[in-house]
């Protein structure tokens, strides 16, 4: 649906058929991470991604996610990647460091490699907040990965 006459508007495309998706999940705060993963995988399948085209890697914590994403991106086997995990505030400043560094790392990998990465790393004050948000955020990460992979394909085709 074009909003302006004579302007090409690229519509969001949530068709997951023929896409290869890599997922990196933190095992820290595993209950929230597993909830994110379940919702994410369910949404990927709902949007047509073949289960055989999804690769899951788990890492100890959120700070390890960017390196695993980078290694996956450099294989050139994935159309998009998804980062999943939960950073929950504790009694020390560590929360701020982990939240900031994991987010910066994900963004850096995305920009350095040109592979779209959906950031599904929750940052919450409590366990209850993480558990309340995990289903929505997991599904959202799946849709973001699919949409951005398709947008990248469309833009790549326009370059030719």
Curated annotation (Swiss-Prot):
Pathway: Cofactor biosynthesis; riboflavin biosynthesis; riboflavin from 2-hydroxy-3-oxobutyl phosphate and 5-amino-6-(D-ribitylamino)uracil: step 1/2. Pfam families: DMRL_synthase. GO terms for biological process: riboflavin biosynthetic process. The keyword Lipid metabolism does not apply. Signal peptide: none annotated. (2S)-2-hydroxy-3-oxobutyl phosphate binds at residues 91-92, 133. Its EC number is 2.5.1.78. GO terms for molecular function: 6,7-dimethyl-8-ribityllumazine synthase activity. It comes from the Bacteria. Keywords: Riboflavin biosynthesis, Transferase. This is 6,7-dimethyl-8-ribityllumazine synthase.
């Amino acid at each position: 649906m074009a909003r302006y006459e004579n302007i090409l508007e690229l519509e969001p495309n949530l068709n997951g058929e023929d896409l290869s998706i890599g997922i990196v999940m933190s095992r820290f705060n595993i209950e929230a991470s597993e909830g994110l993963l379940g919702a994410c995988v369910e949404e990927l399948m709902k949007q047509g991604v073949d289960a055989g085209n999804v690769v899951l890697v788990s890492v100890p914590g959120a700070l390890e996610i960017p390196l695993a994403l980078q290694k996956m991106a450099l294989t050139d086997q994935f159309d998009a990647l998804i980062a999943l995990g939960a950073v929950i505030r504790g009694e020390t400043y560590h929360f701020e460091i982990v939240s900031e560094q994991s987010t910066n790392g994900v963004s850096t990998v995305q920009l350095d490699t040109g592979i779209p990465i959906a950031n599904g790393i929750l940052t919450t004050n409590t366990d209850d907040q993480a558990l309340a948000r995990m289903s929505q955020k997991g599904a959202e990460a799946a849709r973001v990965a699919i949409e951005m992979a398709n947008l990248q394909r469309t833009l790549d085709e326009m370059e030719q």
